[in-house]
Design a protein with these regions (language model features):
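A polyanion-binding, active-site-adjacent surface
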Residues: 1-194
């Protein structure tokens, strides 16, 4: 898939590759700076995102915006936000493997076009799809993983953090680790490994 941004957005908008398209209100392509160094990847749109056509606009989105602000980032400025799937799974369930596979070329092309310096996988579904693993978030935290030559860090999904307040401190540690990793990448030093 060699499409540029406008053609890729149009392809996602017209996609019928899996059953999720049948009940969507809008596709949720992604949002942000198309030249961003930071890419945050979630699992899929919820009801608010389906209605607005933008990722992370509900309560989890408000928390993500606060998390970004805490590390001196903001949506749309050197940050791009995307999801593994571009249509809402019914009942906010996790995307099924076939659904994620149908959207994989779109996310891959977004990453190719962005060429981010760092990817942050938000939650197990994003990490599992980007890293082809079924490992737990807890076991993947605190390490720099590799996604086709791009450093990738795993943390908890903001929706999970809304339900599990005790893991917010761990997510903060992950964000601090991401900042240190990015600083190392920008200075040309090797990224920290733990």
């Amino acid at each position: 898939m060699r499409m540029e941004w406008p053609a890729l957005k149009a392809a996602v908008s017209g996609c019928t590759e899996c059953a999720l398209h049948a009940k969507r209100d809008k596709t949720v392509f992604g949002v942000g700076d198309e030249n961003a160094d930071w890419l945050f990847v979630g699992e899929g749109p919820g009801a608010d995102e389906d209605a607005q056509g933008e990722p992370f606009v509900g309560q989890a989105g408000k928390l993500l915006d606060s998390m970004l602000a805490a590390i001196k980032l903001q949506r749309g400025t050197n940050v791009y936000i995307a999801n593994v799937v571009k249509c809402r799974p019914p009942g906010n369930r996790n995307p099924e493997p076939g659904e994620a596979l149908a959207c994989e070329p779109y996310l891959d092309r977004q990453i190719d076009l962005l060429r981010p310096k760092l990817i942050v996988a938000l939650g197990k579904v994003a990490a599992a799809n980007l890293l082809a693993t079924d490992a737990s978030v807890a076991s993947m935290r605190g390490k720099v993983h590799d996604y086709r030559g791009t450093p990738l860090i795993v943390t908890y999904h903001p929706a999970y953090l809304l339900r599990s307040l005790t893991d917010k401190a761990k997510a903060w540690a992950d964000l601090c680790f991401a900042v240190r990793t990015m600083e190392g990448l920008q200075s040309g030093a090797n990224a920290p490994r733990s």
